Amino acid sequence: MSRKNVLNLINTIVANSCKCPAHSHNYGSAAPTGVQTGQKEYAFEMSASTVRFGPGVSVEVGADLRNLGAKKVCLVTDRNVAKLPSVKVALDSLARHGINYEVYDETRVEPTDASLWHAADYARQNEFDAFLAIGGGSVMDTAKAANLFSSDREAEFLDYVNCPIGKGKEISVKLKPLIAMPTTSGTGSETTGVAIFDYKRLHAKTGISSKYLKPTLAIIDPLHTLSQPERVMAFAGFDVFCHALESFTAVDYRERGPAPSDPSLRPTYQGRNPISDVWARFALETIRKNFINAIYEPGNLEARSQMHLASTMAGVGFGNAGVHLCHGLSYPISGNVRNYKPAGYTADHALIPHGLSVVISAPAVFEFTAPACPDRHLEAAKLLGAKVDGVRASDAGRLLADTVRGFMQRAGIENGLRELGFSSSDVPNLVDGTLPQERITKLAPRAQTQENLAQLFENSMVAY
């Protein structure tokens, strides 16, 4: 599909899709009606899954499902994770408490619309009354989709997908209990109401977003992290890194837009707020102390435990405040991968791990956003270990960008988009793929033009 046809399709969808503040976009032709008060936003709300953390806590999952009244559970995982001790521990716990289950292990690393629909179809063919997700973000997001579409058997796939690609329908059906047990320290999906996937038709990432998608319970067991390969730890860790940085530097919730006429219409991503800041600060300090050790010392339970906790903490923070440009730019990067295959991954297809696609633009992004809130950027740099005494506000972006580059270099991250197979000729297509992500890019503290987006991609061709 040509770029022109893609943009025409997007504009057509926007003009005929949802008009609520949670999914509104500047480039639609029709204005929202009846859902905005015209009053400036004055409130934020905190919503998160119940979280249980502790080494070995996975043994409790059978009792949890029994207490939820589950009779037949869909255990969602992938074929690699299925071989790990974490799944055996869970299966033993289910058996010990008399819980019947079926295993779905066909999750795709970096899910697509087709892979999510495959899982949803599997769930629809069975009468599951609960879901258990054991794996990384791909597994947890797949479980969320399977839960949603098996609970609403009449729904078509695009009904719940975010505008402008989908219809952005609000979830009104009752979902089944979902317990999430992350085995990687990255996405924070165990606490968020977001499921992300590649929409192959447009070579772009999008997702389904609703507070009702949040898992019922997140079981955070640091023992699972000891099986993370080095590169998985590095790439997933940079997702935590950017979740914390982006939520901490997002637009203030009072500046996001007008207040909704009904509190149920307040968007999932609301902008930074005093509560989300607590989680982001904790995550950034924890990253400073533990990230590099967690990458290169796989047996260091303390470092890996702390990164596992930071992942959840950052997830709670960004799950309410939102993310912005690093994630917005990442979706067309991963959606337009050609031949890149990362070391340490066993996937049979080309892929750019999510954390890598996010951090690759981070130095350029934070140099761009810093003029809008330099104090925030200086504080973030300080939390990550930079010396900020005497640094001028005008240098805040450079300092934070250099701090990010330092972590990237120490972690052995690829040096920019060129090393992922991109060139300047790809920039127009990457910009086009970013435009549908306005749901999150509008949360950046500084507004962007298409020319700004193009320059961010150009500046990310070489990271350091």
Swiss-Prot record:
- What protein does this entry describe? Probable hydroxyacid-oxoacid transhydrogenase, mitochondrial
UniProt keyword list:
Mitochondrion, Oxidoreductase, Transit peptide
Q: What does this protein do?
A: Catalyzes the cofactor-independent reversible oxidation of gamma-hydroxybutyrate (GHB) to succinic semialdehyde (SSA) coupled to reduction of 2-ketoglutarate (2-KG) to D-2-hydroxyglutarate (D-2-HG). L-3-hydroxybutyrate (L-3-OHB) is also a substrate for HOT when using 2-KG as hydrogen acceptor, resulting in the formation of D-2-HG.
EC number from the UniProt entry:
1.1.99.24
> Which processes are annotated in GO (biological process)?
glutamate catabolic process via 2-hydroxyglutarate
- The protein's superkingdom reads Eukaryota
The enzyme's first-digit EC class, named in words, is oxidoreductase
Output the Gene Ontology cellular-component terms.
Answer: mitochondrion
Q: Which organism is it from?
A: Drosophila pseudoobscura pseudoobscura
